[in-house]
Amino acid sequence: MNSPIDPAIVMPDVQSSADTRHIQIQRVGIRGVRHPMLVVAGDGSAQATVANWTLTVALPAEEKGTHMSRFVALLEKYRATPMTPALFSQMAREMLPLLHAERGDLTAAFPYFINKSAPVSGVQSLLDYEVIWTARAAGDEVEFELRVQVPVTSLCPCSKAISEYGAHNQRSHVTVSAVMEGDVAMDAIIRLVEDEGSCELWGLLKRPDEKYVTERAYDNPKFVEDLVRDVAARLKAHPSVARFCVEAENFESIHNHSAYAVVEG
């Protein structure tokens, strides 16, 4: 059995000792941390989710190690605080003096839900989106990046043009990575992407809704190239987007492979 620690004894802090190899570490910290998170949703409510966190800082060449426990302490401090992109960026800024670091990155990947009304019946249901927030802090400056994967329907223009009836269509994932400046309206970015698919998706549809989405997609055919170009054009015009990358993957219903395209801007 371990003996109780005598408070008069000074325990050695090995990780704070000097390192003689003189090699800087660009990123060191913790990752794969599942931790509760409150996110301020588009309607202003606090949405409870579970995020997969990565917290890292740069370590100077002369220092042996960083203070790993302080990353978890930072998560605990904000566990009950509803998060906005601005507060998330502040959390990354706060991490630097806590770890005695000049640079650091904070990443949270989490499922996010939006309550949607079906297009005809109006029946409501949740739809989930995969979201990643990243804040890169250097001194007093913080760069915030939003990454969101939005599922949509795509219908092939060529298939429609050559067929007497019908056209092959499929579910597609459009992933936007955007460095944001100023106000960040995550729901608005999701809505922007959904508007550019052949049709958006819903969690629950009645028969009149199914008729609508079938005909909506048929009237709005798009190649994977159309998807990324149309979303990119909208992002270029967005006042809060500094730079972006748009990826689209169509899970082809007539092939055992996907169609894929990327636009960076």
Swiss-Prot record:
Pathway: Cofactor biosynthesis; 7,8-dihydroneopterin triphosphate biosynthesis; 7,8-dihydroneopterin triphosphate from GTP: step 1/1. One of its GO terms (molecular function) is GTP cyclohydrolase I activity. Its EC number is 3.5.4.16. The keyword Nucleotidyltransferase does not apply. GO terms for biological process: tetrahydrofolate biosynthetic process. Keywords: Hydrolase. The record marks 156 as: May be catalytically important. Converts GTP to 7,8-dihydroneopterin triphosphate. NCBIfam families: PRK13674.1-1 (NF010200). This is GTP cyclohydrolase FolE2. It comes from Bordetella avium (strain 197N). The gene is folE2.
